[in-house]
A protein has these predicted regions:
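Pore-lining and gate-forming transmembrane alpha-helices of multi-pass membrane transport proteins
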Residues: 163, 167, 194-198, 202
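Transmembrane alpha-helix interface/packing and boundary motifs in multi-pass membrane proteins
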Residues: 27-48, 203
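Alpha-helical segments in transporter systems
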Residues: 34, 160-162
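Hydrophobic alpha-helical transmembrane bundles that constitute the permease/transmembrane domains
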Residues: 140-144, 164, 168-171
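Membrane-interfacial helix-loop-helix
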Residues: 1-28, 53-147, 151-154, 158, ...
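Transmembrane alpha-helical segments of integral membrane proteins
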Residues: 171-182
């Protein structure tokens, strides 16, 4: 039980995912967060950034035994991550397409909460197909927007285009940001804990803003009704 709890904790830590699971676990986590409804808690943004940073610091390192080595060339890393992200969204879309009605009547659980579907629905109705592109940069939203696109039966060709474009910008922006920062400041590889905390805070800001905007709108609507 103790081992299982430690394993779950490691899944929240980007550095641990990369160090213990390498490229294989990294790709699986990106796939799961973008394609499986219970993957919403996984640290996609910070994971991409840290992967880019560790790739850069590994290239700069002269130590064979460095704990921060992540020997995956950036030209292999980015296409691999993109493939996982695109495939994940296709799985989410198909899942929503086939189980939409059942999903909306399903009871809430630790792995699934309908409020996330409604959050994705609100985001989708405001921005249309662009929600699939922009949603890539928002935790939770990026997990449930492709599922909702399947529920509303968005045309597959359109979804495929939005999926690829969104995945490309999400993967390349965050991974290359980490990569070039690591090239500029290689010492950051020794202070990953601080980097991860900063990234988590930054990634949660858009979700918090959206949440409070929705709350304010609901309060305003109730006030107008009275």
């Amino acid at each position: 039980m103790h081992y299982l709890w430690e394993l779950i904790q490691q899944l929240f830590h980007p550095k641990s995912i990369i160090e213990y699971g390498g490229l294989t676990l990294l790709l699986f986590v990106i796939f799961a967060e973008t394609g499986l409804f219970f993957g919403f808690f996984l640290p996609g943004d910070s994971l991409l950034f840290i992967a880019g940073l560790l790739t850069a610091t590994s290239e700069e390192s002269t130590s064979i035994n460095s704990e921060h080595l992540f020997k995956v060339p950036i030209l292999i890393l980015i296409p691999s991550l993109l493939a996982s992200a695109v495939l994940g969204n296709f799985v989410g879309y198909y899942f929503g397409l086939k189980t939409g009605d059942v999903l909306l009547t399903r009871k809430d659980s630790w792995f699934f909460k309908k409020k996330y579907i409604y959050l994705a629905s609100d985001f989708y109705h405001k921005r249309g197909g662009m929600a699939i592109i922009l949603g890539r940069f928002l935790p939770i939203i990026r997990t449930f927007v492709p599922i909702f696109a399947g529920i509303v039966k968005l045309e597959f060709k359109k979804f495929a285009l939005y999926n690829f474009v969104g995945g490309f910008f999400w993967i390349s922006t965050l991974t290359l940001a980490g990569y070039f920062l690591g090239k500029t400041y290689p010492a950051l590889g020794d202070h990953l804990e601080y980097v991860v905390v900063f990234l988590i805070i930054i990634s949660l800001i858009p979700i918090a803003v959206t949440y409070f905007k929705n709350k304010a709108r609901q309060i305003k609507l109730k006030h107008n009704e009275h």
